[in-house]
Regions:
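Polytopic alpha-helical membrane-helix bundles and their juxtamembrane interface segments
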Residues: 1-58, 63-198
């Protein structure tokens, strides 16, 4: 799925405008490349009981990029056109989004390795997730956007997977990773192509 979506998404890179969406697509393709590399390593070297813990090394890299790219898309739909202007204008929001995402991941990781109880990790992680997506909804153009609703649902399901037994958890994580990390890149290509047709 990663290879197919990457090949499809690369066609969007040949289009130069709208620049902000093309830059966002490049970030999503980097996410897909990291995911692909991680899964190759995961399948070759890592035992089932260590898979969930190891995923966090992927997520610590990819989720900040995914949050920046989805926020950039929503801001584009609000009328923003410059990545540089977005970085200046929404610096505070981006910092808060990335910090709350970090808190969510740290809680999950510490719960997985047994430093804190798993249910405590669920509570902390859920609170951090709500904070993250509330900022995107309220300040970054997520309100009223159907893609925001879909992404929120998919990300929320990671919390459901977290409490499942190892085998079921990793199957669900695999499915959610494919959706969350590949769907948006394909969607961006569609948006870029549609904009150029118009």
């Amino acid at each position: 799925a990663q290879a197919v979506s990457s090949l499809f998404a690369q066609k969007g890179l040949w289009i130069k405008e709208p620049k902000l969406l093309v830059q966002t697509l490049r970030l999503e393709l980097l996410v897909t490349a990291i995911q692909f590399t991680f899964y190759v390593a995961l399948l070759r070297n890592i035992k089932l009981e260590h898979m969930a813990i190891t995923r966090y090394f992927d997520w610590f890299l990819t989720t900040p990029m995914m949050l920046v790219s989805m926020s950039s898309y929503f801001l584009y739909k609000k009328g923003e056109r410059s990545a540089g202007e977005i970085a200046k204008k929404y610096k505070s929001q981006f910092v808060r989004i990335l910090l709350s995402n970090l808190a969510m991941l740290l809680a999950g990781y510490l719960g997985e390795i047994g430093v804190i109880p798993k249910m405590s990790a669920v509570v902390i992680g859920t609170a951090a997730f709500i904070i993250t997506f509330r900022i995107i909804y309220k300040d970054m153009g997520g309100a009223g956007n159907n893609i925001f609703k879909l992404i929120s649902l998919v990300w929320g399901l990671y919390g459901v997977a977290y409490v499942l037994p190892e085998s079921e958890k990793n199957v669900m994580y695999n499915a959610l990773d494919v959706i969350s990390k590949n769907f948006f890149a394909i969607f961006l290509v569609r948006e870029i192509s549609k904009t150029n047709i118009e």
